[in-house]
């Protein structure tokens, strides 16, 4: 899948361990179901459902000013393309470690804004686990590896959530959440 890229795609650091755990999960599920294809579908569905739930919840919470951090994660209140959490990551009190702070600064300085965004989204989800533990429970450690999240991709889910659905529609939680779940399924 990396045909045409200047260098082959490679993973390093934590992603190596996450991949190993993903393979172990697939093997465990294959043994349980007796079929790699069925196991793969089960694991992919679990991952997709988890991230879908979290994206919808975060979008609802940010539009209705319900995020404890009071910082928008997927959008900005002033209409900028760059989410508020990327513009001002340290306004959100998310208990950053010194290494995370440095990583965020480095990613921003290197103009790797989608990578910073992904890191910040994961950090926000982890923080929400304290107040909404059932929705934002700690994920299996391979799941972040499978989260391809971008705010710059015009065809990406974040762009569509922010730009295709008016914020006023997010005011009626039952209707918008029900519609999205119906569409998802």
For the regions a language model picked out, list residue spans one by one.
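Preference for the N-terminal adenyl/adenosyl cofactor-binding alpha/beta module
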Residues: 1-185
């Amino acid at each position: 899948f990396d045909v045409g890229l200047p260098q082959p795609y490679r993973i390093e650091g934590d992603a190596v361990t996450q991949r190993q755990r993903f393979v172990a999960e697939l093997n465990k599920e294959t043994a349980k179901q007796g079929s790699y294809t069925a196991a793969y579908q089960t694991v992919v569905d679990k991952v997709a459902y988890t991230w879908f739930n979290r994206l919808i919840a975060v979008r609802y919470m940010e539009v209705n000013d319900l995020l404890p951090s009071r910082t928008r994660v997927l959008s900005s209140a002033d209409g900028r393309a760059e989410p508020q959490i990327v513009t001002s990551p340290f306004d959100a009190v998310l208990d950053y470690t010194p290494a995370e702070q440095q990583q965020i600064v480095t990613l921003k300085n290197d103009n790797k804004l989608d990578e910073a965004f992904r890191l910040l989204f994961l950090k926000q989800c982890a923080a929400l686990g304290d107040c909404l533990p059932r929705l934002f429970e700690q994920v299996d450690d391979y799941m972040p590896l499978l989260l391809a999240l971008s705010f710059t991709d015009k065809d990406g889910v974040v762009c569509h959530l922010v730009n295709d659905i008016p914020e006023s529609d997010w005011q009626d939680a039952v209707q918008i959440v029900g519609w999205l779940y119906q569409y998802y399924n």
